[in-house]
Amino acid sequence: MKYIKKLIYVLLLTVATQVATAQIKILYGPYLQNVKENEATIVWVADKPSIGWVELAPNDGTHYYGEERPKYFDTTNGVKNTSLLHAVKVKALTPGTTYRYRIYSQEVLSHEGINVIYGRVAACLLYTSPSPRDTR
């Protein structure tokens, strides 16, 4: 009987450890929404409460990872949203320009007042926006 209790304890401990260390994932997206001449909204869903952002660059032939790209966060009144669903509106886009973008979600492990503890980051592959000629 003692052996069975120990076996169950070890099994439960193993399962609990696996659940606690499961990595955050992007489940759906990115989706381009409300695309206009100089703005677009990028939407995606993560599997854990997280903050989200988009990194964006024009498709100008430079290496995307050769320099740091601007980050556009999912915010409300300047505060980063903690959510499963992320929507980032990117403004001031140059008409006629094709862009490359990548979405990110960073898990929020704890958020008490101004104290936030972040976890792991999930990111998608690099996407390229449709050519302006293809959207007419």
Regions found by a protein language model. Name each.
Residues 127-136:
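Single conserved hydrophobic/aromatic residue that forms the stacking wall/gate
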Residues 44, 54, 96-105:
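Short beta-strand segments enriched for Tyr within beta-sheet-rich domains
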